[in-house]
Amino acid sequence: MGQIEETLELTLDFTKLEKVGKQVADTRAAGSADCDPGVIPVAIQNVDTKEVILVAYTNEYAMKESFKKRKLILWSTSRNKLWFKGETSGETFDLLEAYVNCEQNSLLYVVRPCRGGICHTKNKAGAPRNCYYRKIDFDTLKLTFVDP
């Protein structure tokens, strides 16, 4: 796990979408992807707690695979490939519902965890967290752990 996951300093990456766009353009130009890498954001919500537990990306192929298998399947922008959530950790999620926003440029997936949390980070008890486990102080911009 990298320092960014444990720091109490706010270090947002405002260039993420620019990087993803360049990666998509490069992949299309090279013709090297198994499927179109064009992506849209997808918010992941826990059906039981109503918490947003992750924001990730999907492309058309990953979306259709999720719908077909009723499992959380995303597109990894860092690895540029299909991401079966929980494939290595065992933290899989059943896909229960999907919603599209008004501009049809992002999705909301409502999921049920099959076992535990969604994040690759763990709290002090060793349990996987949700991805939103640090709260920002508006005045100082310092972070506080809410699931230590």
Labelled PLM ranges:
Residues 2-41, 46-148:
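C-terminal binding/interaction regions
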